[in-house]
């Protein structure tokens, strides 16, 4: 039995949802109350929720205290505790596999030149891991053994995004991707369960044509997994626990985004959806039995659980609105029994 945990606030009683087709413009309508920019800034927000390795705590980003800082809350419910206190923006929290550290990124005065920080969830000790004002580092992702952090690198004067790996034991950096192509973006590094390779997405066309690559962590040799003719988008969202398949999203074929399983050895895709809505792949469950994907339908985002063995999918019984699986590396607990989502 799988349960779901939401990061949204307590919902009001169900209300009738207006059919968008029935909405008509009224130029003569009066605005009873103006929503000011100041009030918009006062809106409380919660995001970036992610499980602790033992499933007992959820880390998340919130501006409840005025700035986007890191908070912790018991997964069974309770009062949240502010873990970091900073005037700088913080985002993308991710737990180390042993639960001793949480990696996150923070910039300086909103300049979007991000550094990677570590904070101890027990003591609150903060360490600036990269400390490079002229280089932006984003999307930190722990290796399964917790020794390495893969992340995206972009020098301030460059338009190229590359992937580096930081060795927390030796305290040195290895460049996994390099090149000279202008505007190349290597993004979303995803570790295999054995830590031997990383799957990433490369975009050289500003959103119209992209590919999925696999890079060997030791040799830094990259292999193209999605060779194709024409301009189509292929992006990776997760690697199966057995390391044999990649969950991808692509508009190949009819131009609509759909979800498929890419066989790494044969470079063949088994499509899971063939829909006219915008479908996005998300994550495998740790036991390899399920995966999640989302569907944007009539302005609502529905979250689906797909059983790999049977090929059957069903929408999770969530409130109408925008729902998506949370978690920087996985929305599932390690035992695959609980699913974290945002609403």
Task: Outline where the language-model segments fall.
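A short beta-strand motif characteristic of beta-propeller blades
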Residues: 35-40, 79-84, 125-131, 172-179, ...
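Signal peptide processing junction and immediate N-terminal pro/mature segment
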Residues: 2-15
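Short flexible coil/turn linkers enriched for glycine and charged/polar residues
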Residues: 77, 110, 123, 157-158, ...
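Blade/loop signatures of beta-propeller domains
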Residues: 14-35
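Structural motif
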Residues: 67-71, 111-117, 158-164, 207-213, ...
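Short loop/turn segments that connect beta-strands within beta-propeller blades
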Residues: 74-78, 120-124, 167-171, 216-220, ...
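Beta-propeller domains
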Residues: 60-83
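Conserved beta-propeller blade repeats
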Residues: 42-61, 87-106, 116, 132-155, ...
